[in-house]
Each structure stands twice: as C-alpha cells, then as structure tokens.
Amino acid sequence: MSSAVVHSDDLMEPTLQSVVNQKTLRWIFVGGKGGVGKTTTSCSLAIQLAKVRKSVLLISTDPAHNLSDAFGQKFGKEARLVDGYTNLSAMEIDPNGSIQDLLASGEGQGDDPLSGMGVGGMMQDLAFSIPGVDEAMSFAEVLKQVKSLSYEVIVFDTAPTGHTLRFLQFPTVLEKALAKLSQLSSQFGPMLNSILGSRGGLPGGQNIDELLQKMESLRETISEVNSQFKDADLTTFVCVCIAEFLSLYETERMIQELTSYNIDTHAIVVNQLLFPKQSSECEQCNARRKMQKKYLEQIEELYEDFNVVRMPLLVEEVRGKEKLEKFSDMLVNPYVPPEGN
C-alpha cells in the first residue's frame, strides 16, 4: 500500500476509466466531505469525459461555487462553454433559491390579486413550511432546465456530505407540499371566490391553481429523473475522500445511504496522499503517511469491489485548465511515485 503501482492480481482497476468508458451514463454525481478535493475531481472527470463524449455539462450545486475558481472563469446559472473546450460547459446554481423567484418564473403570471389581503402569501407560507420544499423546487427547476438542454452527460459537483443526498427525498417533500396546498385550496376556495368576485378580480383563486400546477409539473420532473438516478446504466456516484478517520466515516455513511436508495456507486477517489521517500527524515511526513496507509488498507478491505483511485498531495493548488488536465490524467492513469519511495 506504499504506492499506487498496479499489480496484475488487482481485482478492480484503480482508476475512473470504467466511468469514462460507460457510454450509457447520463448523470454522474461527485460528492464527499468538504475540503477533500471534490470540485477538483469533478472538474477533472468532466475534462476526461469531454474527450469521449459529444457534450458534457458540469453543474455545481455547492453554495461555495468553486467551479469559477477552479477554471479561472466566471460561471453563473446559465450554462456556458469552458474556455479552451468546444463540448464542455459549466454552470453554478443556488440550490436554496427563493421560492418566490421560482413562482415568479411561471408563464403569464400577473399581479396577485390576493397579495393585498395577504391571503395568497399566507397560503404560500403554510405550504412552504414543510422542511426542504424550497430546495426541492429549486433542484426540480434545475433538472427541468438541464433536461431541455440535451447534454449527453451531466456531472454534478455536489454540496458537502449531509446536503448531497437531499435530492433523493425531494419527490416526497413536493408531494407533501402539494397535498397541503390542495387541502388549503379546497378549504378556502369558496371564501376566496366570493372575495374575488366582489372585487372583480381573477375568478376561482387562480393564483393558487397556478401554484398547484407549477408544483405538480416540478414534482413530475423530479420523480422522472429520480427514477433515472436509480438506473445503474444511467447514473453513478463517485465518492471523494482523504485517508483520515472522519472522511472515511462520512464516505461509509454516504455509500450506505446511496445503497439504500439503489443508486450505483463503485468508485472512490482518495486525495492528498503522501509518498515520502524511504530515506526521508521528515518525521511529520512519515507519521502522516503511516496514518494514511492504515486508512487506505481499511478502504481496500471495505471496498474491495470498488475502483479506488489514489491521488497524491500536490505542491501547488490545482487551478486553471493546464493543471486540471494534468490532474485529470491521473484519474485514468494510476499515479506512480518517483523512484526511491
């Protein structure tokens, strides 16, 4: 375990080549604890995919939005080409976008005749008191947009562990919100009709119907895509970690949760590994390498049927096209430490 040299008796190739080669994949998620090199890995994987796919879209759902920093190029909520590539695009979206912004994006919505009385706002507040409904609708809106863009493969640079798997619960969240809104609409509908009728406003509480239609449309989108997420031919999840206790613990928890949702995961990227020379007198380097070796052995034992990719700790930050491309090469060509290690 002191090096990343491939042996002929290895059961699983220690690279992400199998992910790159799987042409049926449509959705690839890259996730892990904060600070483990998740964004670098997702950018580098997208670069490799761009070599073999017609069109690749890289999406950051991490509020920190590190894609712009990684490529040295500003990205926003609209997909744009990455400088130097003709088939790799990127976008950064806010998964916690305002629910009011989402509803305002509906077609043909004018001024809300209920807003002056606060009734519409009250019903929205009641419906959106369900935990996670803001995030669920934002994510659904992104998926709806992504589906219409027709990219061959989409790579998600996800938020740190803990937020990563929330999307799996979104269909249930939206169904709860829909049920609550429907109940409110049936209860208050007659009252709203009489109020609106006397004011000469829109008939039948139209803004509530629009809200229900909007949420139903998003729920259908997210339910459809979630079914694709559970198809191993279409979706896989790449875990990123470092060889330390907390990161390994988070990775194990994440893999168990992915498995419980029937989402394929068979690749782990272990970043920031030290390979000190045998003659090295750096006590800290040797001590840290010893610790990393212990956790690498645990990873090997726990995930013997996974592609475990070992990536070295680099002396410089991986930022910019050139450095990302070098890093990406190591995802498909196993890193071999210099002689004497």
UniProtKB/Swiss-Prot annotation:
Q: Where in the cell is it found?
A: Cytoplasm; Endoplasmic reticulum
> Which GO cellular component term is one of those annotated?
GET complex
Indicate whether Repressor appears among the record's keywords: no
Q: What is its EC number?
A: 3.6.-.-
Binding of Zn(2+) occurs at: 282, 285
| InterPro entries (UniProt xref) | Anion-transp_ATPase-like_dom, ATPase_ArsA/GET3, ATPase_ArsA/GET3_euk, P-loop_NTPase
Q: Determine the domain of life of the protein's source.
A: Eukaryota
* Keyword Endoplasmic reticulum appears in the UniProt entry: yes
Task: List the active-site residues.
Answer: 62
Keyword terms of this UniProt record: ATP-binding, Cytoplasm, Endoplasmic reticulum, Hydrolase, Metal-binding, Nucleotide-binding, Transport, Zinc
Q: Name one GO molecular function term.
A: unfolded protein binding
A single Gene Ontology biological process assigned to it is:
retrograde vesicle-mediated transport, Golgi to endoplasmic reticulum
Question: What are the binding positions for ATP in this chain?
Answer: 33-40, 244, 271
Among SUPFAM superfamilies, the record links this protein to:
P-loop containing nucleoside triphosphate hydrolases
Oligomer and partners: Homodimer.
Give a short account of what the protein does: ATPase required for the post-translational delivery of tail-anchored (TA) proteins to the endoplasmic reticulum. Recognizes and selectively binds the transmembrane domain of TA proteins in the cytosol. This complex then targets to the endoplasmic reticulum by membrane-bound receptors, where the tail-anchored protein is released for insertion. This process is regulated by ATP binding and hydrolysis. ATP binding drives the homodimer towards the closed dimer state, facilitating recognition of newly synthesized TA membrane proteins. ATP hydrolysis is required for insertion.
Q: Which family does it belong to?
A: Belongs to the arsA ATPase family.
Q: Name the chain's protein.
A: ATPase get3
According to the entry, what is the taxonomic lineage of the organism? Eukaryota, Fungi, Dikarya, Ascomycota, Pezizomycotina
